[in-house]
Amino acid sequence: MAEEGYVAIVTGATGLNGAAIIKRLSEDDNCKTIHCISRSLKDEYPRKIKHHSIDLLNEEPKDIAKKFSLEGVKGINYAYFAAYKEENNEEKLCEVNGNMLRNFVQALELTSIQTLRRVILTTGLKFYGLHLGEVRLPMIETDIRVPETFSGTPNFYYVQEDILKEFSNGKKWDYTIAMPNDICGVSKGSYMNEAFTIALYALVCRELHEPFRFPGNEKFYLGFDDISYSKLIADFQLWMTFKAECSEEKFNIVNGDIHSWSRTWPKIAEYFGVEVPKNQFATDFTLSTEVTLSTPSPINLYEKELGIKHTPNSKIINQISLQQWVKQKKVQDAWRTIAEREKLNAHALEVGTWAFCDFLFGRTYNVISSMSKARKLGYTDYYDTFDGFKETFDELKKQKQIPQN
């Protein structure tokens, strides 16, 4: 149960997850003040929410703490760490995102050590090695870490968890970790969103009078995938903030329905007024790609326990590589026409997450995670995946990122 008059701080305020947390906290009458941190201000906030432009990566903890003091960031009870910086290799991801968390926690301890109760960290299903290939299903929180000696690469989620373990040890504050997957949501000025990319793809297909083919492969289309709606993640993180049993624990947080793209894709097609063609996987395309992942599939860590033979490295197979599709002149021209007609961002194609969606849709293995751990502690909410996409598309229209019709 939420306590009255608590003070929260949220990092990554302009991202999908951070923005959703801020909105959810603002709806909680028990929350007195919300401090939000990002490098730039991309939204207008009500009086209850205080924005602070702070660079967590390039400023020392003592300098961040000084800014906190000067700007009235004090008496923090609950800290939500949703900041993230993309890098082009795993070592750099660990260094950069680890340092941001470390700097933030040290600054908090310098200014709010007497009042801080819990840090709520957002990581993801990459914890299970999902980015490396096929994993053991369903993914449950007691699954082992993927050793670096096995994968050949570090994992920044492990780095961040270890930082919180180290800093909270022997202190009055603790931590808890939420692990979503493929977040669907909206934040003003943020395009790190598969829903936005899907919308761009559908709108250009409509403009060109071309079919709305699933760009991945038939196996994944007919298989299963877990998505996390940002509103549900935020609601879950508020729940875990005050749940004593969540102390020093991590939890999967996905929509909780049984989701297959073979159900969702036709509904998205109907929403945008495009058609899924018959026999959509029967034709060979010049834009098709097939990549074998360089790391062993993490399911092989359980080879002996499961009594299975060695699983080969997983493949990413796309009948249409969106990275190649978006480079076509006809696609660029079509979006330019749409943008001029509807008064939209003419450069939207440049910020679509095409590479990410190639990986997402091209997977040849299922993505299924268990919510049992949270369910056993009383969290029962879920969200229909298509409803989450629909609400996201509707919000993208309101923000004039995509056409109204």
Curated annotation (Swiss-Prot):
This is Uncharacterized protein C757.02c. It comes from the Eukaryota. Gene3D superfamilies: NAD(P)-binding Rossmann-like Domain (3.40.50.720). InterPro entries: NAD(P)-bd_dom_sf, PRISE-like_Rossmann-fold. Pfam families: PRISE. GO terms for molecular function: oxidoreductase activity.
